[in-house]
């Protein structure tokens, strides 16, 4: 009989495949899921609530982007909290237009994504006035919903890994306004006891 192994829980905003999960992989390595439970949360508010309720030991929060500055909803919640910063990581952010298999750019009528992702791709979107822009709570969740609905006239803006996770097709790549786009994430805990050992 094998002994149960404790795995600390880190919550992040978004669905699996979100850039926050990519940041966890960068911070802890590609085998992160072997040693840590990664818990998706639908909103920043839910993220801070889950740690306040003791349902996660850590949360990973996007705090600043090189193109758009502060991720203000996350910053506001962090500043109101008494959480300690126990780790930090910055990752490159590459945005892709992801649709259902067989989707082609000429047929896309609507694009959805998190407002921060949309803001980082404003030049691409401004050049496509025929495309309706739909803000959502999450980049990865947007891809999941587009694929689930099966509407080839809708696409989402998200990271490459989401296409792999949800069975989408990358229609256009590198939509961000600048190739050096990156986001800084903070690993937060209720106490300043350091990041988990993995």
Where are these regions (language model features)?
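Domain-level signature for soluble enzymes in the chorismate/prephenate branch of the shikimate pathway
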Residues: 1-198
């Amino acid at each position: 009989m094998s002994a149960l192994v404790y795995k600390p829980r880190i919550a992040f905003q978004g669905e699996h495949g979100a850039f926050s999960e990519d940041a966890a992989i960068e911070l802890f390595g590609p085998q992160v899921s072997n040693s840590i439970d990664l818990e998706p949360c639908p909103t920043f508010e839910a993220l801070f609530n889950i740690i306040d309720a003791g349902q996660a030991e850590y949360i990973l929060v996007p705090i600043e982007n090189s193109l758009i500055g502060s991720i203000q909803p996350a910053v506001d919640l962090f500043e109101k909290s008494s959480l300690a910063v126990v780790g930090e990581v910055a990752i490159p952010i590459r945005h892709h237009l992801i649709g259902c298999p067989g989707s082609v750019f000429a047929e896309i009528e609507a694009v959805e994504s998190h407002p921060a992702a949309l803001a980082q791709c404003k030049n691409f979107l401004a050049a496509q006035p025929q495309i309706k822009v739909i803000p959502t709570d999450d980049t990865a969740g947007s891809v999941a919903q587009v694929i689930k609905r099966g509407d080839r006239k809708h696409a989402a803006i998200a990271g490459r890994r989401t296409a792999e996770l949800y069975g989408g097709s990358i229609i256009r790549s590198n939509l961000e306004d600048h190739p050096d786009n990156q986001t800084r994430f903070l690993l937060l805990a209720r106490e300043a006891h350091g990041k988990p050992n993995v």
